[in-house]
UniProtKB/Swiss-Prot annotation:
Family: Belongs to the NRARP family.
One Pfam assignment: Ank_2
InterPro entries per UniProt: Ankyrin_rpt, Ankyrin_rpt-contain_sf, PP1_Regulatory_Subunit
PROSITE patterns in UniProt: ANK_REP_REGION (PS50297), ANK_REPEAT (PS50088)
Descriptive protein name: Notch-regulated ankyrin repeat-containing protein
SUPFAM superfamilies reported for this sequence: Ankyrin repeat (SSF48403)
Alphabetical UniProt keywords: ANK repeat, Developmental protein, Notch signaling pathway, Repeat, Transcription, Transcription regulation
Organism annotation: Xenopus tropicalis
């Protein structure tokens, strides 16, 4: 692993950069970051200070493109936030019908492939 890759894998730094890209809704930056972290021990399902994962935050923001990207890189759609709400609960409550449909489709597909 190169020095640049090791600095990218620095967990506290990486977590901050990751959360900031999610907050900004910056899909290109997040995709680049996730692709560069494939060799890292980085958990896309880690919780931020608000008790949300990046997926939960993207659903709250109504950002379907970011939701799809996070799921592609392993975000767990069944994981609950600190209030016990899954991404699907948050999407339904927020009126994000496109995200609701996407999450239902992903849940149906993943449960049928078991």
């Amino acid at each position: 692993m190169s020095q640049a890759e090791m600095s990218t894998c620095s967990t506290p730094h990486t977590q901050r950069v990751f959360q900031e890209a999610v907050r900004k809704g910056n899909t290109k930056e997040l995709q680049s970051l996730l692709q560069n972290m494939t060799n890292c021990e980085f958990n896309v399902n880690s919780f931020g200070p608000e008790g949300q994962t990046a997926l939960h935050q993207s659903v709250i923001d109504g950002n379907l493109e970011l939701v799809k990207l996070l799921v592609k890189f392993g975000a767990d759609i069944r994981l609950a936030n600190r209030d016990g709400w899954s991404a699907l609960h948050i999407a339904a409550y927020g009126g994000h019908q496109d995200i609701v449909l996407y999450l239902i489709t992903k849940a149906k597909y993943s449960s049928s492939s078991r």
